[in-house]
């Protein structure tokens, strides 16, 4: 995907060296935006193989409202292991905020259900947002949300999504985030009887870790291949009824995976 390669090139050329929380060090820039037309194919990187099982199960786990890694482990997904405590708990991370945000007066808000209902009943609304970054809960989270909030937009029968990501690990995290939110947009579009439009990805601190530079430069040498297609089970009309078996990627022919260490 040219948009993603352009991001890597821009940060390598114009980024600044910065220290970071993990002690690894980064090349970073502030403020960057990419746009993917979801009609043109599913935005899954072809210049390195991505582990789609992890991407899809993580999204389903968020949608379940869960914050313990048991579901992930049951499905052979280990991407959250470094942050979980000895009981597998992560604190009030994405699933909690998406499905049961706690208000000051003791109520809980199911943001995902609310936004789907808004899309169906009031598609011209400018309030179709879901927020994961809850300042009142940040100190209780194993890792505060990197993908902080997202907004939907309906025009000409198409559903678009824009994500604001406060912290963007370009080599390891961003490819997962692109695919995850593209999948979510497809799923919500289906249950709302809409086509898909664009996925707009807005990054705050966009960074390449210093121990990912060799891998990023290797990836830039690889030729793009055609994007795959996403096929969802058309019988599913409720967002929370989707399972892993309802998601199929067709025609994914990527270059080999490129290993890199995650910064914790």
Swiss-Prot record:
Keywords: Cytoplasm, Methyltransferase, Nucleotide biosynthesis, Transferase. InterPro entries: Thymidate_synth/dCMP_Mease (IPR045097), Thymidate_synth/dCMP_Mease_dom (IPR023451), Thymidate_synth/dCMP_Mease_sf (IPR036926), Thymidylate_synthase (IPR000398), Thymidylate_synthase_AS (IPR020940). DUMP binds at residues 21, 126-127, 166-169, 177, 207-209. The active site is at 146 (nucleophile). It catalyses: dUMP + (6R)-5,10-methylene-5,6,7,8-tetrahydrofolate = 7,8-dihydrofolate + dTMP. Its EC number is 2.1.1.45. (6R)-5,10-methylene-5,6,7,8-tetrahydrofolate binds at residues 51, 169, 263. PROSITE patterns: THYMIDYLATE_SYNTHASE (PS00091). Catalyzes the reductive methylation of 2'-deoxyuridine-5'-monophosphate (dUMP) to 2'-deoxythymidine-5'-monophosphate (dTMP) while utilizing 5,10-methylenetetrahydrofolate (mTHF) as the methyl donor and reductant in the reaction, yielding dihydrofolate (DHF) as a by-product. This enzymatic reaction provides an intracellular de novo source of dTMP, an essential precursor for DNA biosynthesis. This is Thymidylate synthase. Pathway: Pyrimidine metabolism; dTTP biosynthesis. Belongs to the thymidylate synthase family. Bacterial-type ThyA subfamily. GO terms for molecular function: thymidylate synthase activity. One of its GO terms (cellular component) is cytosol. GO terms for biological process: dTMP biosynthetic process; dTTP biosynthetic process; methylation. It is found in: Cytoplasm. Homodimer. Its main location: cytoplasm.
